[in-house]
Amino acid sequence: AGVVAKKVLADATIPDDASVNEINARIVEIGGVDFSTSLEMTEGALEMTKGALEMTGEPLEMTGEAQRVLEQAIKDGDSIGAVVECVVPDIDLGYGEPFWDSVESVISHAIFSIPGVRGIEFGDGFKAAAMRGSEHNDPIGPDGRPLKNGAGGVNGGITNGAPIVFRVAFKPTSSISRPQQTFNFQTGEMDTLAVKGRHDVCFALRTPVIVEAMTAIALADLIALK
């Protein structure tokens, strides 16, 4: 469905003769370690983690600290979460509605259908809570578009001509081999649970392409509604 939606977006010409034909999602944080400037995994890191991660598609580069966090989680029989950033650079202003079908709510509805999603933020996101209005406001330039993008490309639920920027938080994998205490309904007592088998230490490494697909579906809906 995401592929079909991307085709719809590529064919949907917007007023300035550009098309919404580019959606870019990437991992920017793993286990609390920010490596947003890295895009490809080193060969050594991929070789070290590929068995545990069962990675598919293009690999990611890890900084030394992110690689260490992954290694440590594997050794501990544990798992870690991650943050995926998605950018839609070429979308014109005027898509979305100010209430039920705001751009943020339509995209969020689609993104939260992905298993493991625990949060989403647009633009400055939760950092905006610590800002003053003078910091968070996006001045408008002579062409009618914002000069900065703290709003993440959306004002009042409607695209403002700037790139749509949002980040998605993924939880750690639930099934881990590290022993945990939980209630055993068969015995009626607390018991030790240790999940057997092979599991992803960070399943979020697989998700950027899924985030892109769901974003494409949401944007196709918004274009159809306009």
Predicted feature descriptions by range:
Residues 1-12, 105, 109, 162-164, ...:
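Alpha-helical support elements that line or immediately flank enzyme active sites
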Residues 1-99:
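Glycine-rich, mobile lid/loop segments that gate access to catalytic sites or pores
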Residues 6-7, 50, 75, 127, ...:
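Context-gated lysine
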Residues 32, 159-163, 195:
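Residue-level recognition of conserved structural "scaffold" positions that shape functional pockets
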Residues 60-64, 97, 101, 105, ...:
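Electropositive phosphate-/nucleotide-binding environments in soluble metabolic enzymes
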Residues 77-80, 84-190:
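Glycine-rich anion/phosphate-binding loop at the beta-strand->alpha-helix junction
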Residues 173-226:
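Internal helix-turn-beta structural module
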